[in-house]
From Swiss-Prot:
It comes from Debaryomyces hansenii (strain ATCC 36239 / CBS 767 / BCRC 21394 / JCM 1990 / NBRC 0083 / IGC 2968). Signal peptide: none annotated. SUPFAM superfamilies: GINS helical bundle-like, PriA/YqbF domain. Its main location: nucleus. This is DNA replication complex GINS protein SLD5.
Amino acid sequence: MNKDLDIDDILQEFDDSNVHSKSSKYGIRNSENIYDQLVAAMLNERMSPDVLPYKHELMKEVLTQLSNQQQYLLDSHEYGDSNVESGIVTGDFKLQLMIIETDIERLNYLVRLYLRTRLAKIDKFTIHYINETSNDDPTNDRSLLSPEETEYMHKHFKILTQLYNNSFLKKMPHFLTLLDDTSGGQSMISVPDINQPVFIKVITKVPIIINLDEDEDLELVENGIYVVKYSLIKKYIEIGDIVLI
């Protein structure tokens, strides 16, 4: 094997090899497409000032892939242990298991990074997202948050409210204890700054026209890199025409 190959080359070579067919009954397939989609989702989430719609279908596919790979590894290790003295377990077989373990680790890392980024925003703007998702069905594939994120958000808010009440709110007049007070021209609710500038790359072939102000439009073309207000291109990120970089 060429020592200059990186892990992606090795994984691709592995996916194209005959040995891969042994794992077909576990539903293990080429994970490069899943990996690329997960990288894009993770980068978009990390670079955006607010929470993007949860990738329901992608995450379901990723978690299924991880479960299948882990089951395959478990069964393969049991097979290897029971045949260790027979000579059946070859170097190629061991390499196959090492490659799958590497694939599991990199997918796990991206999933954790994606979810931690989302939870950090939920922690920071809890009341805002409670209001934003008040009419959402978390089981719907188009909902902003996953069911687990929604549950986490409400538990986090409950704990936070109890902490504030026990620490200092119970000693204050009632009209000063509202965490979501918007009266007096000053909102107590922290919200993401959707007008901050972000770096973007256009990946759709169809040019996108965005309105900068009353007299000026900006044409975004394929493979072009721009710095624009997040609010102007958020919808294009959600439909996949633009990615954040």
